[in-house]
Regions:
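Non-catalytic substrate-recognition/targeting regions of SAM-dependent transferases
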Residues: 1-3, 21-98
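Non-catalytic accessory regions of SAM-dependent methyltransferases
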Residues: 1-6, 116
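Carbohydrate-binding surface patches
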Residues: 8-13
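Helix N-cap motif at beta-to-alpha junctions
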Residues: 16-19
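Rossmann-like S-adenosyl-L-methionine
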Residues: 69-174
């Protein structure tokens, strides 16, 4: 998987086949995007998934070192999706830091939330909760077992001016 957050590519490689080719393919991807006029400031590797153990691959994370290139100092960035602003921590967040594949589902939640009371379990960065609040939910409660995820969701709510309509709970929903 390669996700793009602003000017950073975040790669999560889970198979031997990709692992042995990453030193060629990841810089090539950055070069192709740059040739298209896009700014790419670095490639961050999130190779810390347990699935790598089953493939016999080492766990690790960090910037891909490409000779002659520098990468950003921060592993946090801000993105905007469907008019909602999010801080994304691609070093410590789940998977690559944000679930980009859920964009249309988040939009759907915004479209059905008006006037409702919403419970968002497993909130992570608060993405579904924020979309519900922006969609007109009367109140939203966002729950996650991770204190750092709850804190990121709080920050994202504040960034979008929604903290007065949302509660945040750090708890295991099971």
């Amino acid at each position: 998987t390669v996700d793009r957050f602003g000017t950073v590519l975040v790669a999560q490689i889970l198979s031997v086949g990709m692992e042995v080719r990453k030193e060629q393919l990841l810089p090539l991807l950055a070069r192709v995007l740059r040739a298209d006029g896009q700014q790419i400031d670095g490639i961050y590797q999130r190779n810390d998934a347990a699935l790598r153990d089953k493939e016999g691959l080492e766990q690790g994370k960090g910037w891909l070192e490409i000779p002659g290139e520098q990468h950003p100092a921060s592993t946090e960035t801000e993105i905007c999706e469907n008019g909602v602003y999010y801080k994304v921590d691609f070093e410590n967040g789940q998977k690559t830091g944000f679930f980009l594949d859920q964009k249309f589902n988040r939009r759907a939640v915004a479209n059905i939330a008006r006037g409702k009371t919403v419970l968002d379990c497993f909130t992570h960065t608060g993405s579904f909760a924020l979309n519900a609040a922006l969609g007109g939910a009367a109140h939203v409660t966002a729950v996650d077992v991770s204190e750092s995820a709850v804190e990121m969701a709080r920050r994202n709510a504040a960034r979008n001016g929604l903290e007065d309509r949302m509660d945040f709970v750090c708890e295991d929903v099971f």
